[in-house]
């Protein structure tokens, strides 16, 4: 992370993060030292405020209205430094997760969260982007139409008739 500090040099705790952003829970692995926990809490705090600045949202939106949990240094997956666990609605980062991992996983969480408002027949573990790719029926709403336009720009070629090179990889 190369951005400005949002803490003015002060240390924050994971409890501070939970309270301020409204996360449902925060779990820290038992093998995480106190020093690692402090460094991580400060980095999480700054990364979450970077996301707030970029998206022009407030603290409560970052936790998707209190529906998200965080895990650090626990419950990892082989070959993954970070992942979003949809059944738990949990952002999980390993101790060695790199810069940008939190934002990347947050967008998976948002994709999952928004599906309940995006789709006419939502399912608990369905993601909006996949449902859109599968031509699922959408709830008619101006924001949903804008999101569908974004998906078209991200996933289809210039004329909108086929998957783009990124999707095909």
Feature map (PLM): residue ranges:
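Active-site-flanking segments in enzyme catalytic domains
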Residues: 1-36, 59-169
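Zn2+-dependent metallopeptidase catalytic core
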Residues: 34-63
